UniProtKB/Swiss-Prot annotation:
Ranges for region Disordered: 637-667
Function: Probably plays a role in facilitating the assembly of multimeric protein complexes inside the ER. Is required for secretory polypeptide translocation. May physically associate with SEC63 protein in the endoplasmic reticulum and this interaction may be regulated by ATP hydrolysis.
Family annotation (NCBIfam families): PRK00290.1 (NF001413)
Primary localisation category: endoplasmic reticulum
GO biological process assignments: ERAD pathway; fungal-type cell wall beta-glucan biosynthetic process; IRE1-mediated unfolded protein response; karyogamy involved in conjugation with cellular fusion; post-translational protein targeting to membrane, translocation; SRP-dependent cotranslational protein targeting to membrane, translocation
Source organism: Candida glabrata (strain ATCC 2001 / BCRC 20586 / JCM 3761 / NBRC 0622 / NRRL Y-65 / CBS 138) (Yeast)
Region of interest: Nucleotide-binding (NBD): 132-286
Family listed: Belongs to the heat shock protein 70 family.
Reactions performed catalytically: ATP + H2O = ADP + phosphate + H(+)
Protein name: Endoplasmic reticulum chaperone BiP
Phylogenetic lineage: Eukaryota, Fungi, Dikarya, Ascomycota, Saccharomycotina
Segments crossing the lipid bilayer: none
GO molecular function, a single term: ATP-dependent protein folding chaperone
Class of enzymatic activity (EC top level): hydrolase
GO cellular component terms, semicolon-separated: cortical endoplasmic reticulum lumen; extracellular region; fungal biofilm matrix; luminal surveillance complex; nuclear membrane; perinuclear endoplasmic reticulum lumen
Amino acid sequence: MNAIKRLLPVSLFLYALFVVLLPFQARAKDDVENYGTVIGIDLGTTYSCVAVMKNGKTEILANEQGNRITPSYVAFTDDERLIGDAAKNQIAANPTNTIFDIKRLIGLKFNDRSVQRDIKHLPFKVVDKDGKPVVQVKVKGEDRVFTPEEISGMILGKMKQIAEDYLGKKVTHAVVTVPAYFNDAQRQATKDAGTIAGLNVLRIVNEPTAAAIAYGLDKSDKEHQIIVYDLGGGTFDVSLLSIENGVFEVQATSGDTHLGGEDFDYKIVRQLIKTFKKKHGIDVSDNEKALAKLKREAEKAKRALSSQMSTRIEIDSFVDGIDLSETLTRAKFEELNLDLFKKTLKPVEKVLEDAGLEKKDIDDFVLVGGSTRIPKVQQLLESFFNGKKASKGINPDEAVAYGAAVQAGVLSGEEGVEDIVLLDVNALTLGIETTGGVMTPLIKRNTAIPTKKSQIFSTAVDNQPTVQIKVYEGERAMSKDNNLLGKFELTGIPPAPRGIPQIEVTFALDANGILKVSATDKGTGKSESITITNDKGRLTQDEIDRMVEEAEKFASEDAVLRTKIEARNKLENYAHSIKNQVEGDLAEKLEEEDKETLLDAANDTLEWLEDNFDSATTEEFEEKFEALSKTAYPITSKLYGGADGSAPVYDDDEDEDDDTDYFDDEL
């Protein structure tokens, strides 16, 4: 029996508040001048957001649709990969190949209860691969599997691209946020996703802590005790922080990694399934396309009910040609979800208890995450805090990315953030199994990080040559009730009576919440260690390298496809523009022969496009454009006094959505 026995504690606790004294000495060791611009990314369950700090100002960046938040969706069609708005917009037509809610699977095992619960409601297939959940979809007609890290990497890659488009240069480093209650495996997996996206994740920051930075930047006078209540699309966190003179110190954190707006949507979906079955006798609970439509409309209805008392849910030809038409009131929505709303108050009570504070000690509570717009959520919280109103000074959708960008600015040496110090905590107790299956804590929950703690243990039987170190996280007294992070053995212990050998076990928890454990035989000096990685299913370096290569291949394919689509659109817009103006504004100005020449050329081009819309290459679209412009230009130049009859040169940077760019009657 390779159990180990607790002998006596050794106080080698590196007190985390040391960071306050020398917050920037550590930074000097980092090669900050090589980071370039470091971006802040809020990788959300339903939406993601990216921000950057430049010249002391923090900017939330808009995507190509002009939206400051981007759906955390990835879709595969017969021709292409879509990410963000484009992926979400086609889900009803392509539900089994559109991936969302991937954050609910990342870093977890396939047999995890929450994973099993979630996959029942997901329209795409989730299968078991080596004990991990992976997504199975059709890519260009073939079955492919993707890990949650790969899908998250695609979303992070999209955020990276948005930042690069804004900055006009490559981005290689980022700060990424995670729920405060994410465990070690989920944090490691998120870092791996960043690597797959081509990003070096300098720091993993807890979401409520990042939001607190956004809230507290301008509150530098007296000490503030604040609670950040972060209710997003799929996760829920509460953190209690003290803020004073630029020091953000987390006192306690709690939450639920499987509670958020998606759960509220699902309650609406279930209600609509029930009423539709009652009215029409049709059960759509296994119809993926119908469920995708319901999910889309449920989210819209939920959003509408934050500002109005009732809303209509209308879906034409919902199933078998039958329309769906229902009214949902705010009162009914609140009734459906009241148990979940009330459930969010438990972690609030928990952080107050852990920090040894009372409600009256809280100066402010800050609402983060889109779900905090729900009036009933705000009402319950205000009632809990005896009528105190929530702080409305920050945008709940953008606060986390804003705070992440500020932390990115701290790490990259941006101006204006020199005095900011972030002291976060670990969310779960970390310890090892000792005699009798007892969980012996080394680092208690809500300990400031980074931190290091050592303790002396010994053997449980005479002449024991080996001890097995099993590392757990959790709050239960028995190790079997907690989450096993990893295990390793220390061998070659010289024969000795039980209790004599001294085995020093050291836990080192870094600023990202990632753990390294070592065990040293004090007698021989022999040591073994583990950084908690592959024992709990983290990707190997080979797997990460393969996924990086595939991500680059996808990005290259996306770029080629984007160029092709731009060339196709340019040609189609030009042909339609010629046709419309020949039949409209220029009809009276052109000679019949010229009019016929232009119409024939435009119609021939449009017919060719119809026949070759998907199969033609970028070069063929460009050649057709050149041929059409050579036909059109001599005719139009006669109208406007053109001299040489040569084809015009078109600027690729022009706005190609404007049909009049190529052929305009008002030059």
